[in-house]
Amino acid sequence: MDWKLQKIELENFKFFKKPFEFALNGKNILLYGENGSGKSSIVWGLYTLMESHKKPVAEIQKYFNPDNDQNLRNRYSTRTEHSSIKTTFIPEGRAVLPKDYEISDTNISTKTAGDDFIRLTTAAFDMFNYRMLSDWIYQKNSR
């Protein structure tokens, strides 16, 4: 069965202080915009959630712990404000319920026993960014 990413929700994560929903509706997207507009935060949020199944719980929790130097919380959020990354995947052409995943200061649903969806999806997941494109162009032009 084919699944598509319907939306990413970020709250108190990097650039996004207020709850932010980015609806992809299963489409391919190209993110562009001014510096400091949150593009990297969206990509980093998706990457962090997708890779979380590989990490111990403590390694995931540090991203939401305001006392940890490696936290990814919005710098203007208070210590008590909820911080999270959520995704919803929808099945293509089937009457099956969507799959929702969250990593946050209170919940890590990507490590649920018996649910291999994130692990299997990550195996086919590749982040393509400007560094990869730049390296590819450099290698091609250096020949």
Enumerate the predicted regions with their spans.
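N-terminal nucleotide-handling cores and adjacent loading/scaffold lobes of large enzymes
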Residues: M1-R143
